[in-house]
């Protein structure tokens, strides 16, 4: 079986145990030599003779799928599958799998690290100290504040656990929320609008789909508390970035941290 392997962390020389397992399964592996997500025009010649595809963050469009007559399965190396044209894969009878929860601890911990960095203004104070300014700023104490978690899946639960350790009040919104889990762990269940209005910190852990695209829009932002900290550790398209920019400009937010942006090539830092 010939398999294309494109995730950058699964390339030779990275010491990946997962790659060793894959090598034991197939001796005909094709690797991503560009060390970045591949475009559709780069994927097609690599995939055309492959039976399997372990996919990173490549653009797996209808054009790619239709050009691959031998492809039998697409396995996403990660939880998200928004870069895969699911309808095209289904039409061609190609199953698409993912690995939910594979990096839940890492992303949940990163989310809380970002919350701490923003609440205590660590990047700002680091820069000011390096510039010889020695600004005195205590930031915001998290104890007793309310964190609203949108998406209480594997990652959201890690973030909630971290927040509980800081004695924060934890509330959550999820269309498929596990009420028994919330009751056991002291997590308040809220509707979307309620969470937006009540939270001092909002953490996004949602998949990107039609129902979540621009979920955080101008109306949602207008209903947030002044100075809300918004952390997006899911997908860029969940936030209307133009509306978020305006909110920052008008000082409605304390900070928006976007770990994922809609179009990376268009971002200016």
Show where each model-derived region lies.
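Rossmann-like adenosine-cofactor binding region
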Residues: 62-65, 175-269
């Amino acid at each position: 079986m010939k398999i294309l392997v494109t995730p950058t962390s699964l390339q030779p020389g990275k010491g990946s145990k997962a790659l060793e397992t894959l090598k034991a399964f197939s001796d005909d592996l094709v690797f991503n030599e560009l060390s970045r997500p591949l475009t559709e025009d780069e994927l097609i010649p690599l995939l055309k003779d492959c039976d399997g595809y372990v996919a990173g963050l490549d653009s797996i469009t209808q054009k790619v799928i239709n050009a691959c007559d031998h492809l039998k399965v697409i396995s996403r190396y990660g939880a998200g599958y928004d870069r895969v044209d699911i309808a095209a894969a289904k039409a061609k009878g190609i199953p698409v799998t993912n690995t939910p929860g594979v990096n839940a601890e890492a992303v949940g911990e990163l989310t809380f690290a970002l919350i701490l960095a923003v609440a205590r203004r660590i990047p700002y104070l680091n820069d000011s100290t390096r510039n010889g300014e020695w600004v005195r700023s205590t930031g915001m104490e998290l104890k007793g504040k309310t964190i609203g978690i949108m998406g209480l899946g594997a990652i959201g639960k890690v973030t909630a656990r971290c927040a509980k350790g800081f004695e924060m009040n934890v509330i959550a919104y999820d269309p498929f929320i596990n009420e028994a889990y919330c009751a056991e762990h002291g997590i308040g269940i809220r509707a979307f609008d309620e969470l937006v209005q009540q939270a001092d910190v909002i953490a996004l852990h949602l998949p990107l789909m039609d129902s979540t695209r621009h979920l955080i829009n101008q109306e949602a932002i207008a209903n947030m508390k002044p100075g809300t900290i918004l952390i997006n550790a899911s997908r860029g398209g969940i936030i209307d970035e133009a509306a978020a920019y305006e909110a920052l400009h008008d000082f409605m937010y304390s900070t928006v941290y976007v770990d994922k942006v809609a179009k990376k090539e268009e971002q200016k830092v």
